[in-house]
């Protein structure tokens, strides 16, 4: 993802990020684990979703932030149509130019904290990986959740970092020895539940990336009040 770091990506920067980001053994393991969990989640949604998921291209998903399109193929392989969005224009451009299939509708650059350029309820789901641990102010997380609730008809699949002492210590040591100032936002489970509820969601499921070790969790949020008709 790229909305987090206040960094402007040009095309060479995107190419370099894509090449380097998941090159290490530990990061390849994380990437594989994330995708395994997400496939199980999507499989569960398809079973609950009925006929809509059975018709190829009937379900429309917003990937926000899309980054360079790391999850595009995974989402399209489940039969959904896909729209990619990110703060960085060249990230969106890269995600779209991969042309994973005709069901990859297109993309748009947007700052989710300020609003998405879409009509209410136009998407069935919003998919948001590796965004929320970069949103430090509570009001930013709440604003993004409200915006996701506005454009999603069914719900949201997103990741967040839940407070975990072991992972927090590991991050602290990494900053100490690598002299990096980059920090991530971990929130208590109760705080995440409150913020989700405030935006109109109930939490259906939360899956830890690595239970007891890693702070990242992947949550399935259901929009309260049932699904409405897509405009």
Predicted regions and their residues:
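A conserved beta-strand element that flanks and buttresses the S-adenosyl-L-methionine
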Residues: 127
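Conserved class I S-adenosyl-L-methionine
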Residues: 1-49
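Class I SAM-dependent methyltransferase SAM/SAH-binding core
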Residues: 62, 68-114
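Short alpha-helix
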Residues: 183-199
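Short, glycine-/aromatic-enriched active-site segment of Class I SAM-dependent methyltransferases
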Residues: 165-182
């Amino acid at each position: 993802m790229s909305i987090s770091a206040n960094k402007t990506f040009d095309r060479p920067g995107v190419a370099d990020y894509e090449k380097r980001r998941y090159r290490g053994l530990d990061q390849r393991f994380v990437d594989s684990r994330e995708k395994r969990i997400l496939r199980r989640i999507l499989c569960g949604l398809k079973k609950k979703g009925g006929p809509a998921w059975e018709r190829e291209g009937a379900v429309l998903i917003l990937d926000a932030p899309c980054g360079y399109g790391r999850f595009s193929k995974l989402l399209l392989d489940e039969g959904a149509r896909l729209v990619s969005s990110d703060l960085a224009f060249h990230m969106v451009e890269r995600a779209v130019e991969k042309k994973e299939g005709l069901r990859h509708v297109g993309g748009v650059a947007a700052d989710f904290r300020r609003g998405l350029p879409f009509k209410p309820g136009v998407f069935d789901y919003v998919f948001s990986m590796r965004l929320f641990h970069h949103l430090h102010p509570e009001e930013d997380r709440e604003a993004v959740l409200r915006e996701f609730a506005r454009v999603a008809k069914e719900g949201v699949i997103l990741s967040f970092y839940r407070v975990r002492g072991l992972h927090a210590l590991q991050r602290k040591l990494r900053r100490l020895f690598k002299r990096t100032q980059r920090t991530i936002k971990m929130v208590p489970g109760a705080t995440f539940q409150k913020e989700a509820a405030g935006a109109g969601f109930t939490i259906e499921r939360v899956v830890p990336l690595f239970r007891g070790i890693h702070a990242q969790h992947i949550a399935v949020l259901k929009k309260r009040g049932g699904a409405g008709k897509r405009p």
